[in-house]
C-alpha cells in the first residue's frame, strides 16, 4: 500500500512537471539478477600416518677408578747461622797545606806595522761583436698517405649440431645450442694525413701518420652442448640395529688407610754466646804543624823602551798614459733574409679498395636428432 501511494504521488508530480516544463523523467534503473553465492565447505584435512617415535635409553655412564690422594707433610724449615756484624772506626783525616802560587813571566808585546798594499795592473776589456747567425736551407717534408688496410676474406663459420645424449635410467633433458652470432660488416677506416705546416727557416718536424691497425683473424667460437648428467646407481641403505648395551660393573672400592703421621722432632736449639766485643783503641792523633810559608820575591821589573817607529815612505806614484783609443767597430747589419717558400704539394689519399665479401646468408638451424631410448 505504501509503495502504491509513493508511485501515485510520483506520477502526479511527474505529470505536473511535464505539463509545466516538458521534462521527461529518467527511466528506472535496471537491476540485474545475480544468483546467490554458493559456499563450499573446505575438504577435510588428510591426516598422514606417522609411526610412533622410538626412544632409546642412553648407555649407563662409565665411572673410572681414581686412587685416593696422598698427603705429604712439608719439610721443617732450615735456619742458617749469621755471624754478628763487625764495626770499624773511620781513619783520622790528614790535613795538607796548599802549594804556593807560581807566577810566570810574560815578555812585553812587539808591535809591527802592516805592509803597504800592492795594486796589480789589469788591462782594459776587449769587446767583440758576435758573428751573424747562419741559417741553412732545409726543404719541406713530403707527406705520404698510409696505404689502405687490407681485409682478408673469412668464410662464414660452420656450426655442427651436438651428438645425441645417451640416457641412463631416465630420459635426459634436451639441450639446444644457441644460434650463431650475426656479425655486421663495417667498412675499414680511412686515415687522412694532415696538411703540412709552413715554417720559415726552421727544419720542420717530420710527421709520420700512424700505421693502420692490423686486424687479426679470430675463428668463431664453437658452442658445445654440455654432456648429459650421469646418474650412478646407489644401493639402498642398510640399517643395522645398535648393539645391546654392555653394563660394566665398577670395580670394588678399596679403602687404603692413610699412613701414620710422622712427627719429626725439631733439632735442639744450641745457643752460642756472642764473642766478646773487641774495642779497638783509635791511634793517637798526631798533629803536624803546617810548613812555614815561603815568600817568593817577584823578579825585578825590567822596563824595555819600545822600538823607534819606522816610517815607510810610500812608493812614488807612476802615472801611465792611457793606451790610444782603438778604431770604433762598425756594426754591419746582416743581409735581409730571403723568404723562399716552395709550393705546397698536397697529395690526396688513394681511393679505398673495397674487397669483395659474399652476401650474408641466413643461418640454417638444424634441430638435434631425437634421443634414443
Curated annotation (Swiss-Prot):
Q: Isodityrosine cross-linking: where is this region?
A: 329-332, 363-366
Q: Where in the cell is it found?
A: Secreted, Primary cell wall
sequence repeats span 25-33, 34-40, 41-49, 50-56, 57-65, 66-72, 73-81, 82-88, 97-105, 106-112, 113-121, 122-128, 129-137, 138-144, 145-153, 154-160, 161-169, 170-176, 177-185, 186-192, 193-201, 202-208, 209-217, 218-224, 225-233, 234-240, 241-248, 249-256, 257-264, 265-272, 273-280, 281-288, 289-296, 297-304, 305-312, 313-320
Changes after translation: Extensins contain a characteristic repeat of the pentapeptide Ser-Pro(4). For this particular extensin, a typical repeat of Ser-Pro(3) is found. In both cases, the proline residues are hydroxylated and then O-glycosylated (arabinosylation). Synthetised as soluble proteins which become insolubilised in the cell wall through the intermolecular cross-linking of Tyr on adjacent monomers. Isodityrosine (IDT) stabilizes and makes rigid the part of the polypeptide where IDT functional sites are present.
Where are the residues of the annotated region 13 X 9 AA repeats of S-P-P-P-P-V-K-[HY]-Y? 25-233
Any one cellular component term from GO for this entry? extracellular region
The processes (GO biological process) annotated in the record are: plant-type cell wall organization; response to abscisic acid; response to jasmonic acid; response to salicylic acid; response to wounding
Q: Does the keyword Transcription apply?
A: no
| Region annotation (5 X 8 AA repeats of S-P-P-P-V-V-Y-H) ranges | 249-320
Q: Which UniProt keywords apply?
A: Cell wall, Cell wall biogenesis/degradation, Glycoprotein, Hydroxylation, Repeat, Secreted, Signal
What is the source species?
Answer: Arabidopsis thaliana (Mouse-ear cress)
Task: Extract the signal peptide range.
Answer: 1-19
Chaperone as UniProt keyword: no
- Can you name this protein? Extensin-1
Tissue expression, as annotated, is:
Predominantly expressed in the roots. Not detected in the leaves, nor in flowers or flower buds. Wounding reverses this pattern, turning on the gene in the leaves and repressing it in the roots.
Function text? Structural component which strengthens the primary cell wall.
Pfam families reported in the protein's UniProt record: Extensin_2 (PF04554)
InterPro entries, sorted: Extensin_dom
Q: Locate the region Disordered.
A: 349-373
* Induction comment: By wounding, water and cold stresses; in response to plant hormones 2,4-D, BAP, GA3, SA, MeJA and ABA treatment; in response to L-Ser, Hyp and L-Pro treatment.
The segment annotated 5 X 8 AA repeats of S-P-P-P-P-V-H-Y runs over: 241-312
Kindly list the GO molecular function terms attached to this UniProt entry: structural constituent of cell wall
13 X 7 AA repeats of S-P-P-P-V-Y-K as annotated region, ranges: 34-240
> What's the family?
Belongs to the extensin family.
Amino acid at each position: 500500500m505504501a509503495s502504491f501511494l509513493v508511485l501515485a504521488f510520483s506520477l502526479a508530480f511527474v505529470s505536473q512537471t511535464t505539463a509545466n516544463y516538458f521534462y521527461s523523467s529518467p527511466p528506472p534503473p535496471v537491476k540485474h539478477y545475480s544468483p546467490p553465492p554458493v559456499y563450499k565447505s573446505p575438504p577435510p584435512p588428510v591426516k598422514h600416518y606417522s609411526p610412533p617415535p622410538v626412544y632409546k635409553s642412553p648407555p649407563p655412564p662409565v665411572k673410572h677408578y681414581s686412587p685416593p690422594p696422598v698427603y705429604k707433610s712439608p719439610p721443617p724449615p732450615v735456619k742458617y747461622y749469621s755471624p754478628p756484624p763487625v764495626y770499624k772506626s773511620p781513619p783520622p783525616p790528614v790535613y795538607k797545606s796548599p802549594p804556593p802560587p807560581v807566577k810566570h813571566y810574560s815578555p812585553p808585546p812587539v808591535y809591527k806595522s802592516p805592509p803597504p798594499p800592492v795594486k796589480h795592473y789589469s788591462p782594459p776589456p776587449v769587446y767583440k761583436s758576435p758573428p751573424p747567425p747562419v741559417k741553412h736551407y732545409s726543404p719541406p717534408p713530403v707527406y705520404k698517405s698510409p696505404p689502405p688496410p687490407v681485409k682478408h676474406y673469412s668464410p662464414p663459420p660452420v656450426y655442427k649440431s651436438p651428438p645425441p645424449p645417451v640416457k641412463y635410467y631416465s630420459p635426459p633433458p634436451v639441450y639446444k645450442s644457441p644460434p650463431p652470432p650475426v656479425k655486421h660488416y663495417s667498412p675499414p677506416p680511412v686515415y687522412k694525413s694532415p696538411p703540412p705546416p709552413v715554417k720559415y727557416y726552421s727544419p720542420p718536424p717530420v710527421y709520420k701518420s700512424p700505421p693502420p691497425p692490423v686486424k687479426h683473424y679470430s675463428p668463431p667460437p664453437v658452442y658445445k652442448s654440455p654432456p648429459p648428467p650421469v646418474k650412478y646407481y646407489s644401493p639402498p641403505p642398510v640399517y643395522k640395529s645398535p648393539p645391546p648395551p654392555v653394563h660394566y660393573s665398577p670395580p670394588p672400592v678399596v679403602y687404603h688407610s692413610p699412613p701414620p703421621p710422622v712427627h719429626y722432632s725439631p733439632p735442639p736449639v744450641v745457643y752460642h754466646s756472642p764473642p766478646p766485643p773487641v774495642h779497638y783503641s783509635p791511634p793517637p792523633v798526631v798533629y803536624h804543624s803546617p810548613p812555614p810559608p815561603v815568600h817568593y820575591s817577584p823578579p825585578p821589573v825590567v822596563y824595555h823602551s819600545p822600538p823607534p817607529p819606522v816610517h815607510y815612505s810610500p812608493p812614488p806614484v807612476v802615472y801611465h798614459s792611457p793606451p790610444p783609443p782603438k778604431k770604433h767597430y762598425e756594426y754591419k747589419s746582416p743581409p735581409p733574409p730571403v723568404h723562399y717558400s716552395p709550393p705546397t704539394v698536397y697529395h690526396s689519399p688513394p681511393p679505398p679498395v673495397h674487397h669483395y665479401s659474399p652476401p650474408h646468408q641466413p643461418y640454417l638451424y638444424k634441430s638435434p636428432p631425437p634421443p634414443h631410448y
